């Protein structure tokens, strides 16, 4: 590989990354300050824990959509992701999970790695659906058990205020499922109680949850006061830059996601989001009533947006790679060091993506 400014856990190295059999074996070079040279940046590949679609395809469309989605997102530097479902009837969710279970066992050439599933709904508050279809219902352990047998579900979004959900949070978190608070009308107290029961993060912080008020802190207040992790959509549409800065100061391991829809990587027009039809225009995706419906954000643009609001490149990278990996307990992803997967992205000095590598394989995304 050519010489780069390589971001490692111990800082910047001017040098070369050496990899074999999909893993980093060495990083050769010397410590540096990228400001002292004009070399490109080599960063860990982006890890997106909230992906509904891309390239015109939607996860809920099933197996025929998965390769399109993973090939689309790898073009923008996402080297691994969680396939994220929508609220839907039980049989539809079961079918998609069954197909995802098989897909997670492979990685087609030229694609990002699917690390597992983020089940966003149906265990959410029907009063805070956002862009979710109206199939929300109370969680039943037998139903969740059936889902878990179909696919590697890593994350479940849940509204903690619904009766019985506190016990589910406790039981599933003990089994290693990351339980996230989201699509909720819960109070501050209910948010804090959910964290105590084992919830570990918040789904698209600020969006589709009870807001912060100085006498009713709400779920947002619980996150800002107590969370170690939370996801946030940094498209500069879903969350004001000022609110982003508040979260960055308050939540140590805040990480960023796209919450991308089928419209990601596509021109303006109409696309599917679960059972909804959404419209991409003016840089966003909306339902017919104007409600924001996921995003068209890509992770390379997320990096540029974080730098735009004042984060150094190293911290922006951390919130797109290392923190998502840490959240899922993935020690071999999200950082560039010997023993880690050779997942990396090269960007020029304007932060434009020029090269992507997934598990040591160079992606020919320019001709995709």
Predicted regions and their residues:
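Divalent metal-dependent hydrolysis catalytic cores, especially in the metallo-beta-lactamase
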Residues: 52, 67-96, 112-125, 151-161, ...
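Active-site loop-to-helix "anion-binding N-cap" substructures in soluble metabolic enzymes
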Residues: 46, 53-59, 82-92, 208-224
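His/Asp/Glu-enriched, well-ordered alpha-helical/loop segment
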Residues: 219-229, 249-258, 263-340, 344-347
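Active-site gating loops and adjacent loop-to-helix segments of metal-dependent hydrolytic enzymes
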Residues: 71-82, 126-150, 193-205, 219-229, ...
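C-terminal cap of metal-dependent C-N hydrolases
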Residues: 4, 326, 335-368
């Amino acid at each position: 590989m050519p010489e780069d400014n390589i971001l490692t856990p111990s800082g910047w190295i001017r040098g070369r990354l050496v990899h074999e059999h999909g893993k980093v074996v060495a990083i050769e070079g010397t410590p540096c300050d990228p400001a002292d040279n004009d070399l490109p940046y080599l960063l860990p590949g982006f890890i997106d824990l909230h992906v509904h679609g891309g390239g015109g395809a939607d996860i809920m469309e099933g197996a025929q959509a998965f390769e399109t989605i993973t090939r689309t997102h790898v073009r923008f530097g996402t080297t691994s992701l969680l396939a994220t479902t929508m609220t839907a009837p039980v049989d539809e969710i079961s079918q998609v999970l069954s197909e995802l279970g098989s897909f997670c066992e492979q990685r087609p050439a030229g694609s990002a790695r699917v690390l597992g599933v983020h089940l966003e709904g149906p265990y959410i508050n029907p009063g805070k659906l956002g862009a979710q279809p109206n199939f929300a219902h109370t969680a039943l352990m037998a139903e969740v058990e059936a889902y878990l047998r179909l696919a590697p579900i890593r994350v479940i979004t849940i509204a903690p205020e619904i009766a019985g959900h506190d016990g589910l949070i406790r039981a599933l978190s003990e089994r290693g499922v990351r339980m996230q608070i989201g699509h909720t009308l819960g109070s501050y107290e209910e948010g804090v109680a959910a964290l105590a029961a084992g919830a570990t993060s918040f789904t698209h912080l600020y969006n589709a949850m009870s807001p912060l008020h100085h006498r009713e802190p709400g779920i947002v207040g619980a996150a800002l006061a107590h969370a170690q992790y939370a996801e946030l959509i940094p498209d500069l549409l879903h969350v004001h830059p000022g609110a982003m800065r508040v979260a960055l100061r308050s939540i140590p391991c805040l990480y960023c996601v796209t919450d991308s829809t089928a419209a990601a990587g596509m021109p303006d027009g109409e696309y599917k989001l679960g059972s909804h039809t959404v419209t991409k225009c003016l840089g966003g995706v909306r339902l017919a009533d104007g409600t924001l419906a996921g995003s068209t954000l890509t992770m390379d643009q997320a990096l540029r947006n974080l730098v735009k609001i004042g984060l150094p490149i190293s911290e922006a990278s951390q919130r797109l790679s290392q923190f998502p990996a840490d959240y899922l307990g993935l020690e071999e992803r999200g950082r560039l060091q010997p023993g880690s997967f050779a997942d990396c992205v090269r960007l020029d000095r304007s932060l434009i993506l020029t090269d992507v590598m997934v598990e040591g394989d160079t992606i020919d995304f320019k001709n995709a």
